[in-house]
UniProtKB/Swiss-Prot annotation:
Belongs to the zinc-containing alcohol dehydrogenase family. It catalyses: L-threonine + NAD(+) = (2S)-2-amino-3-oxobutanoate + NADH + H(+). It comes from the Bacteria. This is L-threonine 3-dehydrogenase.
Length: 347
């Protein structure tokens, strides 16, 4: 088992940015595994932490190592771990659940009452090594590219968002084409949606959405999404709306563009409470609204694995940049600019 020091990206104090430094390699307990990180992906949550915005100030306790999307090789296992072996190539579910609350005991551990998140509430993966509970391990095929393997967790968000509905044969609208929105476009197309409408203001990401399978892209700075969706659906609206932006105006538009009897799935995290027209946009339309959090453990991971292994989705276009961990600032500046898809850091 490894001991000594490792390089790691730390949030040292309550301020903008992060610091690359040396810290002790994590010591694992009897139920944990130690993983040597091969690739780590920057998530929108990591950008919130890097920016040190209101959410980060309220949630994050510094100093700590952040990052939660990764792939790597198991280098050590705790004394009570029999399900994971040294040398296995893995990724990890990032929600650490208690296994004792009512949701956990009734097959809904993705909404565990006592959830902790790797890289948010515990030390994360922007480092040479990370430790995780053995129960969170997901084994990867030996031939899977480490960068692809590192983005299975956010792909799981997209899969969960889209496949809680039955998009086949209908129209899916994806509002917000950040990396998870881009992956949701690919999932909807793979699931048989006849139309996948990608909506954003970022022309770079709308071009990526086309590569990911969008049948139509809508720039909100040039076009009216409601008119476009109405025209493409003979006035009926989208059967499924996936809200990924978190903007109040986008949420209102999403509810308005959903078809009567349709579904509105929201993964985004609005910064402030949002007022919606429940009477006209939800009740009278018979709309189903579903909040999406995390991934179902582990049925969503199985869907992710099968979508990748069957080549039903191509994730290559969404990974636009890779940097060594030492050049993390370039990666975070790209993420902050929006002129990228997924950015990968290599320790």
């Amino acid at each position: 088992m490894q001991s000594g020091k490792m390089k790691a990206l730390m949030k040292k104090d309550g301020a903008f940015g992060a610091v690359l430094t040396e810290v002790p390699i994590p010591e694992i307990d009897k139920h944990e595994v130690l993983i040597k990180v091969k690739a780590a992906s920057i998530c929108g949550t990591d950008v919130h932490i890097y920016n040190w915005d209101q959410w980060a100030r309220q949630r994050i306790k510094t100093p700590y190592v952040f990052g939660h999307e990764f792939s790597g090789i198991v280098e050590g296992v705790g004394e009570n771990v029999s399900s994971v072996k040294v040398g296995e190539y893995v990724s990890a579910e990032t929600h650490i659940v208690c296994g004792e609350c009512v949701p956990c005991l009734t097959g809904k551990s993705h909404v565990c009452t006592n959830t902790a998140i790797i890289g948010v509430d515990t030390a994360g993966c922007f480092a040479e090594y990370v430790k995780v509970p053995a129960d969170n391990i997901w084994r990867n095929p030996a031939d899977m590219d480490p960068s692809i393997a590192s983005i299975q967790e956010p792909l799981g968000n997209a899969v969960h968002t889209v496949l809680e509905s039955q998009p086949a044969g209908g129209t899916t609208a994806v509002i917000g084409c950040g990396p998870i929105g881009l992956m949701a476009v690919a999932v909807a197309k793979a699931a048989g949606a006849s139309q996948v409408i990608a909506i954003d203001k970022n022309e770079y990401r709308l071009r990526l959405a086309k590569q990911m399978g969008a049948t139509c892209t809508v720039s909100i700075e040039k076009e009216d999404p409601l008119k476009i969706v109405s025209a493409l659906t003979s006035g009926e609206g989208a059967d499924l709306v996936c809200e990924m932006s978190g903007h109040p105006s986008a949420i209102a538009q999403g509810l308005a563009m959903a078809a009567n009897g349709g579904r509105f799935h929201i993964l985004s995290l609005p910064e402030h409470p949002v007022t919606i027209d429940l009477t006209n946009k939800v009740v009278f339309k018979g709309l189903t609204i579903q909040g999406i959090t995390g991934r179902k453990m582990f049925s969503t991971w199985r869907q992710v694995s099968q979508l990748i292994s069957s080549n039903m989705i191509d994730l290559a276009p969404v990974i636009t940049h890779q940097f060594p961990l030492e050049e993390f600032e370039k990666g975070f500046e790209l993420m902050r600019s929006g002129q990228c898809g997924k950015v990968i850091l290599i320790p």
